[in-house]
């Protein structure tokens, strides 16, 4: 997993368009 440098505590991952998903309050790319 690669951290996308974004948190998803209050809002979803904006970086999800790049393939990132929320895991443990942080956005990761598999």
From Swiss-Prot:
<feature type="disulfide bond">
    <location>
        <begin position="13"/>
        <end position="27"/>
    </location>
</feature>
<comment type="similarity">
    <text>Belongs to the cyclotide family. Bracelet subfamily.</text>
</comment>
<keyword id="KW-1015">Disulfide bond</keyword>
<protein>
    <recommendedName>
        <fullName>Cyclotide hyen-H</fullName>
    </recommendedName>
</protein>
<comment type="function">
    <text>Probably participates in a plant defense mechanism.</text>
</comment>
<dbReference type="InterPro" id="IPR012323">
    <property type="entry name" value="Cyclotide_bracelet_CS"/>
</dbReference>
<dbReference type="InterPro" id="IPR005535">
    <property type="entry name" value="Cyclotide"/>
</dbReference>
<feature type="disulfide bond">
    <location>
        <begin position="4"/>
        <end position="20"/>
    </location>
</feature>
<keyword id="KW-0960">Knottin</keyword>
<dbReference type="InterPro" id="IPR036146">
    <property type="entry name" value="Cyclotide_sf"/>
</dbReference>
<dbReference type="GO" id="GO:0051715">
    <property type="term" value="P:cytolysis in another organism"/>
</dbReference>
<keyword id="KW-0611">Plant defense</keyword>
<dbReference type="GO" id="GO:0006952">
    <property type="term" value="P:defense response"/>
</dbReference>
<dbReference type="Pfam" id="PF03784">
    <property type="entry name" value="Cyclotide"/>
</dbReference>
<feature type="cross-link" description="Cyclopeptide (Lys-Asp)">
    <location>
        <begin position="1"/>
        <end position="30"/>
    </location>
</feature>
<feature type="disulfide bond">
    <location>
        <begin position="8"/>
        <end position="22"/>
    </location>
</feature>
């Amino acid at each position: 997993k690669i951290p996308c440098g974004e948190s998803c505590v209050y809002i979803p991952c904006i970086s999800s368009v790049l393939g990132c998903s929320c895991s443990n309050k942080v956005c990761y790319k598999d």
